[in-house]
Amino acid sequence: NYKNYTVPEGVYGLTVPIVTEKTTEKEAMNNKRVPRKEMYDFILSDLEKAEKYIDGYEGSALEPGAAMVDGLLARTWLELGYVSDTEFDNDAFKKAQDYAEKAIAKSGKTPLTQNEWEDSANGFNSASSQNSWIWGIPVVSESVGNLTSFNAWISSEATWGYGYYAQFGAGKSLYDSISDSDFRKHSFIDPKKSEYYDYKLAGSSDQIAAFYKRIKSYANIKFRAKYGEIDNYVTGGVGDYPMMRVEEMYFIKMEALARQHNLTAANEVLTDFMSHRITDGSYESSAATEKAFLKEMLLQKRAEFWGEGILIYDYKRLNQGITRGYTGTNFPATMRFNTSGRSPEWNIVITRGEFQANTGITPELNNPDPSQVIPLWE
């Protein structure tokens, strides 16, 4: 049973070694993995110092500010609310809610509009073209090559990168679950292509025609080449990367409310948030149980943060499985795994180099190898 894989003797609850600016070389050579509580105490001590030192400083989307620290604290307290799969900490959920609300208020940020989301020149690559990002990573032309930038890997439009050939996209089941009234669905190419929607694409009419000929169904166009420069990596590859958008704070708030058994308020936050995504006012969240609410919330969060590195934490925190094997699936045959809870592939195996350099970690205290633990769906 693959579930047993995730709880090997002696490893459950261990995180990583703590390294600070005061850690000596000798100490680093015998530095053990610390338990979850010790690690979170360390994380919180750093964040609480940051909260104190940076108080009142607005920063920008590309440098730390008070709202960013509040956002990190909101993330941290949300995780701490889950003591185990069956034990929860309401005080931690309340703190997560409070810090999420602070981040929203201090940042002055607002959810992306449809025009900003679908912008063929600046979509998800520019910290300055919208008012959503609380924190992002700037990218400059000196640090990119045709294959050495995030855009090179993720952009299906950029002719100079891997994304042009890989065409990363949504699973069919996710795509089908997103409402046709939700403009986030336009992040992925429908099987009917331009007959379904007049996608906002970069390039000339000839380039757009060529794009439609080669693009696969469900491929993403969420992440754009900078300035729409699909043929020039020097310019098109210089895309900032979003690390924290204000939208995430609304999701943290609603999850924290639901876990405090305030479903009415949680439904209200989700309904209000979705008015920014299904703008005709037709969406209403009316989940009657926490389980039903969290299921709906996670669906909307998947549509919101696809490709941004946010969702793996939700899946692990909420003990969600993956479903890639099903009738009509568009996943490659070698990737059709189904799990009923956390997937073993999300555990990171520690490499041999760490054992050789750090005697505090031995192979016996490694995370287990997930290779071939889950059978392929057929």
Model-derived features with residue positions:
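Short, cationic low-complexity segments
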Residues: 156-172
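Acidic/polar-rich alpha-helix caps and helix-coil junctions
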Residues: 1-151, 162, 175-378
